[in-house]
Amino acid sequence: MRIALLPLLLFLHLIAHAQQSERMLHIQRSTTEIKLDGNPDESAWQTATVLTDFQRQFPVDTGLATARTELRLTFDAQHLYIAAVCYQQRSSYTVPSLKRDFPSGTSDVLNILLNPSKDGLNGFLFGISPLNVQREALIDNGTTLSYEWDNRWESAVQNFDDRWVAEIAIPFKTLRYTVSQGDNSWLVNFLRGRLNTWEVSTWRPVPQQFPANNLAFTGTLYWDTPPPKPGVNIALIPYSIGSYTQDYKRNPNSLELEEKTGRWSGDIGGDAKIGITPSLNLDLTFNPDFSQVEVDRQVANLSRFELFFPERRQFFLENRDLFAMFGFPGTRPFFSRRIGLARNPLTGFNESVPILAGGRLSGKINDDWRIGLLNMQTKRVEWDSMHALPGANFTVVTLQRKMFGRSALSGIFVDKENALGGLNETQRAGYNSWNRIAGLEYNLNSADNRWTGEWYYHRSFSPDPGQRGYTLAQYLGYSERHLNVFLAYMRVDSNYTAEAGFVPRNGIQNFYPGIGWTFYPKHRFINTWRIGVEGDINYSFDWQETDRDLSFLLDIKLKDQTSMVFRVFNNYTFLFEDFDPTNLNEPGTLPLPGNKGYAYSGARFDIVSSTTYNLQGEMALTAGRYFNGRLLRMEGDISYRWQPIGTFAMSYSFNRIRLPDPYAAADFWLLGPRAEMSFTRKLFASAFFQYNTQANNFNINARLQWRFAPVSDVFLVYTDNSYAEPVPNSPVRFFTPKNKTIVLKMVYWLNV
């Protein structure tokens, strides 16, 4: 039955294949030097083909854009050049700050989308605002953007009353591509976003139901003469760091201060990026440090399971789909945050684990094959005589074969080897000497992006027979202008173990069905509205229902891009063991009894305001039954844009849980004021505060960044953790310190 589904997916892919609306562009090599000054007056620009006639994508996907855009492309031995004339009144600019890598939908922008591999899945985005603020991102799985990726490129902008003019130079060394003897062509698209008119437009039309940056909808860039073969592409990225840390060690029972320690430390390390071939890259790292990476945003965890946090460290991002996208979101065989990060059992915080060295080879072998190899070694950490984390070696091998244009058949092997030597018997408890995963999967993506699907089978291996299991899943979805329907099935064996992956729950079968219908009314304010039904239902292997989340929803999107979702849900949870929904487990309260099912229902309202306005926000309000009690939850974010200086914001989360006596009741607050300032295009500052009563922690993270050269920075980072609330019968008060750290770090990017 399971094996028979793969040919069915292939068949559906073939019948879903549709021709794209063809757009073509020929690019010629420049015979003159291009001076990057925002004034495209060189002779190469006068003879280059002019691209116009951008098509609207939002709020409607018919008709031409209301503001004219003119694009020209040329190249020389080192760079791909783009010249753009974007007509727009200077007084109507929306540019929130001068900081690089601004989020999508927050600024007026011109985006260049490049897909040199022509797979419709993996590419590059380069964006520029009217004030010459840059952003770049990797694109994987057709639409997913990784703005954490940084690389070198240049741009210049001139502003006029009725238009802004940009010149962009992208080094060929920055891109990954191959040069063939015959036809040379890339897939490309260009996107323009203007917030004051709520309009998004593209050169190659993109249907409104899909993201505008979707690589399934691209035109073809033909090179009249082949692009240059990239020469030796080697970049060295050394760093040096100095830090001072204060720790406040307290008695775990009385919380009396036992010892206050302070220590200075310094270190050096770095990365190297080596282009093995124009489309295959080797990343090496020695003693890496990620102290400048933005801290995780804390959330109130009311569930029984581990929460997922995204990877932000740049070393793991390029070609990340080759490593991170296997499996479903709840069954990832490899999760890069298992490397170099671990929970300290004494403090409850995630802390850095020293990485000694590592390497990562990823990219295309040829037009049909991609490969990913990763090996990293971490250092042993001993917290005390009872708690330790063994040093570990992580190895990942992946291989992907392109099929039918945008689909792929892939295999993965993951190996984690724990070095248990040197640990005492207590410290060894719970660790295997090794754990391995082998898996195979097929991903379906039709040419017109209407059909998507996934099929996989993974198996785990460990010395302990009780940790040798499997997981399998199947997904098929169909999306067109009005109809969206999908069905997923996932099965996770009780013995399936992925120590280097993310598998928060075992021993379940999961069904995830959904169907929705979108309407496009001719209305002054409403752009679309959608009704739908979605389910997330878990069963044990003997078909006992363990969890159910059934939702009926109404989704409304306004023409100014404000969105609202009304949802009514019916939930069911079977507790196999006692559980405190507050996760506090405080004395004097009892957990809910296990071996019992709880049915409860409620409603939720979400609203996200338009980013057009300087004052904006989002809110989610949930109210209803919760196990045998009630829950009121309010969470969201409100921000003010002082353009182009910066943004001041406050995130908030409030959870009120009321269960009948003698069970728990609690109010949880999570407040996160933050400020992001851009003094120039090279000097930035940010401050982020997180007040979390559930974790009883108040975190401060402040960062000053000076970009003194392209992709080269000096960071000054201050981090402080203290108590958010007093603890009865102890010396702990609000703001009683836990630890403090100040770090000065310099990173330099050197092209060899």
Predicted feature locations:
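Exposed, low-structure sequence patches enriched in small/polar residues
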Residues: P354-L356, S362, D448-V752
